[in-house]
């Protein structure tokens, strides 16, 4: 019987396999035949990923791929020292000329975007800027009047979220401030934008991104009543009570 495993180039790839099995099938069970047959089945220690038919003496040497050089060059262009033009981020906010993320809404004095909710007319610096800084055009980079830091609008994408639209000026109103009806100019917000918070004077203070949100009055009472319904009490029935045979009327025994 010549099966796949009894061939010279069989699965185990041992040269003594065919001769050992052929002699064994003829009835010549001498010591040499037994040794050859045993050696044939001891030679199966080939790795699983290696083919016994491959010529391992003519293996291809390792070569550098032409794509490796292009990948290295691209990485150096982006992350290397020579690629400084690709390193624009929020840490490079100095002026519009070098700011890779130019804020198109909050850069002008009359377009809003001062540190506290609108640049106003840019004539009274610390009155319409909201951050008590004389530079109305750079208000988004100045700290608030109350010592509270204000996020740069270039790193604040929520200042351009749809829905916060100033219908009078046509520009989105930032979360930092601006009157809900006046669009963050000096007077339409209700009061001049030089409040103690320095974030959003007048009506805009409630919509500031870092304003403290508290619930009081009827809303607080309604919230407390709703939360009390979820508090566990003596009448609460848990699934383990049914498993243990507890009664819902008297869960504590």
Swiss-Prot record:
Coiled coil: none annotated. The lineage of its organism: Eukaryota, Metazoa, Ecdysozoa, Arthropoda, Hexapoda. Residues 125-193 are annotated as: Disordered. Residues 125-141 have a biased composition (Low complexity). Sequence-specific transcription factor which is part of a developmental regulatory system that provides cells with specific positional identities on the anterior-posterior axis. Binds the consensus region 5'-TTAAT[GT][GA]-3'. This homeotic protein controls development of the cells in the posterior thoracic and first abdominal segments. It activates the synthesis of the decapentaplegic (DPP) growth factor. A motif (Antp-type hexapeptide) lies at residues 237-242. It comes from Drosophila funebris. Its main location: nucleus. One of its GO terms (cellular component) is nucleus. Residues 176-189 have a biased composition (Gly residues). GO terms for molecular function: DNA binding. It comes from the Eukaryota. It is found in: Nucleus. This is Homeotic protein ultrabithorax. Keywords: Activator, Developmental protein, DNA-binding, Homeobox, Nucleus, Transcription, Transcription regulation. Belongs to the Antp homeobox family.
